[in-house]
C-alpha cells in the first residue's frame, strides 16, 4: 500500500480513498480537523517554509524522525507525543523545534510564534463544512477528533453548529492513533465504535480506528470523501468542492 499519511515532514504521497467497512449500522461520523476540514497540511507547511526561509532539509530530517516515531509500531515518547497529549506546551515545543531547524540565510530560527507561523496559511474547506452540516442534518451524530499542536486556536464558536462532541488530544491526554481516544470519541456520541465512521487524512489513524471497530475513511479531497461517505451512510452529500486547495482563512491553525 502506498504512503497515504498527510503529515508535515513527509513529502512522498499516494493520495487515494481507503475505506475499511465493518458492516454495522452507522449512526455517527467522527472527523479530523487539520488536512480534512482545512486545506492539506503539507501545502500549509510549505508556505511557512518559504515565508520564514527555513531550510527544507533540516525541517524534513527532524520531522521525519519525530513523525515516523510518533506513528510507527514501536513508537516511543518524543516531542510530538508530548505536544499532542498536552504534556508539553506549544511554547516549549517551539523552543525544541526551533533549536533543530536551520534557515537558508544562516540566521537563528525564531521560536516565539513558530507554530502560529507554521500553520498561518491553513484555510477552511467550505465544502467539508457543508458536508458535516448535511450529515448532521440527516440525523447522524457528529464529532471532531483532533490531535492538537496547541489547544487555543480552534474556532470553537463554530462547533455547536457542527458537532455533538469535541475531542481535542491535548485536553484529554490521549492522541491518535491510540485506540483509547477513538473509544473516547465514540462514547462522547453515545455510540459504539461499530456505529461510527472515522474520517482522517493519516492512514495510520484510519487503520487504528478500524482496529477498534469503526468504519475508516481515508481523506484525500472533499469531493471523493463526500461521495464515499454518502455511499456509506445512504444519504446524498452533494456540493463538495473537488479542490482542497481553495477555502477561507481558518483561525484553527495549530492542529492536525
Protein language model annotation of sequence segments:
Residues 2, 6-31, 133, 145, ...:
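Asp-based, Mg2+/Mn2+-dependent phosphohydrolase catalytic module
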Residues 72-113:
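A metal-dependent, Asp-based hydrolase signature
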Amino acid at each position: 500500500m502506498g504512503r497515504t499519511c498527510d503529515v508535515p515532514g513527509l513529502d512522498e504521497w499516494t493520495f487515494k480513498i481507503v475505506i475499511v467497512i465493518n458492516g454495522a449500522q452507522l449512526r455517527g461520523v467522527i472527523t479530523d480537523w487539520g488536512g480534512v476540514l482545512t486545506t492539506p497540511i503539507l501545502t500549509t507547511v510549505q508556505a511557512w517554509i518559504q515565508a520564514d526561509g527555513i531550510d527544507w532539509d533540516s525541517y524534513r530530517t527532524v520531522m521525519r524522525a519525530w513523525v515516523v516515531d510518533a506513528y510507527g509500531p514501536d513508537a516511543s515518547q518524543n516531542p510530538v507525543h508530548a505536544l499532542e497529549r498536552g504534556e508539553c506546551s506549544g511554547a516549549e515545543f517551539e523552543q525544541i523545534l526551533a533549536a533543530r531547524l536551520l534557515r537558508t540565510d544562516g540566521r537563528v530560527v525564531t521560536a516565539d510564534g513558530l507554530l502560529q507561523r507554521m500553520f498561518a496559511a491553513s484555510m477552511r474547506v467550505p465544502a467539508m463544512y457543508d458536508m458535516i452540516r448535511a450529515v448532521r442534518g440527516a440525523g447522524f451524530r457528529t464529532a471532531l477528533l483532533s490531535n492538537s499542536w496547541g489547544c487555543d486556536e480552534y474556532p470553537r464558536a463554530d462547533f455547536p453548529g457542527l458537532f455533538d462532541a469535541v475531542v481535542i488530544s491535548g485536553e484529554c491526554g490521549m492522541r491518535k492513533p491510540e485506540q483509547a481516544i477513538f473509544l473516547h470519541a465514540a462514547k462522547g456520541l453515545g455510540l459504539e465504535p461499530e456505529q461510527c465512521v472515522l474520517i482522517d487524512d493519516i492512514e495510520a489513524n484510519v487503520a487504528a480506528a478500524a482496529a477498534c471497530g469503526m468504519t475508516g475513511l481515508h481523506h484525500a479531497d472533499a469531493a471523493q470523501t463526500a461521495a464515499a461517505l454518502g455511499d456509506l451512510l445512504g444519504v446524498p452529500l452533494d456540493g463538495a468542492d473537488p479542490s482542497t486547495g481553495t477555502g477561507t482563512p481558518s483561525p484553527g491553525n495549530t492542529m492536525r
